[in-house]
Every structure is written in C-alpha cells, then in structure tokens.
C-alpha cells in the first residue's frame, strides 16, 4: 500500500518512469542540493570535484568567465566573506555526459544544476546516480534532486504539506518520490 508522495527504492521504478517524471523536459532545470551545508561540506565538495571531474569553466565576479582546471576553495571563502554571498561565482563540470553547474550563492546551501534534457539514457542516468552516491558518501549527508528552486525554505508559509525531493540519496540508498503513482484506496 503506497501513501501519496511516498519515497520508494529506485529499483522499483523503470527507466521510462524516471525519464517521464523525474527528467521530464519542461523547460526547467533540476537542482541538486546538500541541505544545511557547511563550509566544511563545501571544502569536501570542492576537493571531491577537483579530484574526480574536469572543470569546464569557472566564473568569478565581474562576469568574466575564465578557464581554470580546479575550484579554488580559498577564493570561494573570500567572496563569501567579502560579499556575504558569491552571486557571480559558478563552476561548470561534466559528470559523464551531463554538464553540471554549481552556484556558490550561499555558504549554507550547496547547489548544483542540471538540464534534464541531458539525461538521455539509463546509462547517463547511472552516471548521475554515481555522482550523487559518491558525493553523499564523501559528505556523510543526504543529497537530493528537486524541481528547480524547490527546497523546504522556498515553500510558501501557507503550504502545509510534507516536502519531499524528487530523488534522495543517502549513502548507497537511492529513493524516488513516485508522485505519479496513485495512492492506495483506503
């Protein structure tokens, strides 16, 4: 018996369902969040990405895109400390075939963006799951995939439902919110 918005093991969901409902091409992006992030998490993330992925582009203040081969965590901290938030800093890197962009908006919210159009096959989906699983393990924290800008903090104060991500990764455990499945009749 399934409750509305119940998280289910990813193994119980077909690639076709993932493609249609999680990676639906609707003009919006999907966000990857590490909620309640700390600067220590950001440092771990930067080290993890620098070791495992190739940085495609890194943009600092003034809007000038520069090519660097690694994320400079000290520069991130400097921008957070001097500006309160690093609005003009982002890094682009590839996870397999998927371009990922990370924005350094706030030091307490680690966010990556991806275009769901780029998740073109089950094999490419697995590349993303590998990234999310390894990141969750490196941080020892839950990593979630959501609709664009969908975090608990972004919800209206009048909304009283339970917030659930599209997909949740906690270590090696991956769960999907199978919102398209009808709840069991009571």
Descriptions of predicted regions:
Residues 1-9, 114-186:
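Acidic, proline/glycine-rich low-complexity IDRs
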Residues 37-40, 96, 107, 117-119, ...:
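Generic structural motif
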